[in-house]
């Protein structure tokens, strides 16, 4: 009997990024189904998907990946949604000498200064997003405020965006927790920073 191919999927089944997590899970299942012609087998070996909920929390994601490698004996893992969770998971892949395919977290540091040889990614990173957005309004006399989530995704994204700007000026950076539902105070700080600036004003939300 050929040995099963076990793939760990660590994603936000619950938590603030649940919507992205559901998309990731659906994409992985559809992709495997398509790639195997609906058989979920490769060379006679059955593909088994082991799903783990990181809850959008770095410590939970780290322990869930460790469990997938050690207890479930997965051959490789996919995930997570959150960049903060991804950064916590990177050393686990290295310690276990097993592949982690990061999807869809985009922080530059995942495949930048925090990268190790077991880490791959299928999507773009923050710098690529930033370069495209900066090209759209990087002009003299433009004032820009940023509004981002206060963790690796938001902070890496703002840094990449600032690095891509050559002419426009960043006049304010606002970071809010991922579970924020009342933006009144943060928005007011943005408006106060922008109100007396001449020329075109842009709020860039990450």
Describe each PLM feature range:
Residues 9, 79, 204-205:
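Redox-cofactor binding/interface segments in oxidoreductases and associated redox assembly factors
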Residues 12, 54, 149:
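Cofactor-binding loop segments of dinucleotide-utilizing enzymes, especially the Rossmann-like FAD-
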Residues 19-26, 34, 38-112, 122, ...:
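Beta-alpha junction/loop-to-helix N-cap segments that form part of ligand/metal-binding clefts
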Residues 7, 74, 198-202:
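Local beta-strand N-terminus motif with an aromatic residue
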Residues 63, 108-109, 117-206:
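Extracellular/periplasmic Venus flytrap/periplasmic-binding protein
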Residues 7-16:
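Acidic/histidine-rich, surface-exposed loop or edge segments in extracytoplasmic proteins
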Residues 1-6:
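Short, low-complexity disordered leader/linker segments with a strong preference
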């Amino acid at each position: 009997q050929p040995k099963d191919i076990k793939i760990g999927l660590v994603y936000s089944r619950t938590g603030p990024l649940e919507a992205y997590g559901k998309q990731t899970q659906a994409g992985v299942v559809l992709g495997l189904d398509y790639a195997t012609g609906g058989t979920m087998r490769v060379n006679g070996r059955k593909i088994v998907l082991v799903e783990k909920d990181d809850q959008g929390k770095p410590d939970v994601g780290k322990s869930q990946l460790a469990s997938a490698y050690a207890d479930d004996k997965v051959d490789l893992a996919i995930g997570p949604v959150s960049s903060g969770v991804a950064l916590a998971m990177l050393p686990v892949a290295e310690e276990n000498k097993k592949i982690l395919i990061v999807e869809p977290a985009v922080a530059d540091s995942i495949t930048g200064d925090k990268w190790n040889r077991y880490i791959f990614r299928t999507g773009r990173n923050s710098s690529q997003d930033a370069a495209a957005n900066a090209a759209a309004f990087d002009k003299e006399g433009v004032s820009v405020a940023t509004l981002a989530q206060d963790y690796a995704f938001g902070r890496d994204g703002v840094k990449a965006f600032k690095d891509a700007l050559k002419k426009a000026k960043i006049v304010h950076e606002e970071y809010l927790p991922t579970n924020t539902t009342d933006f009144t105070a943060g928005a007011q700080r943005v408006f106060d920073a922008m109100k007396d600036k001449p020329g075109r004003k842009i709020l860039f939300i990450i």
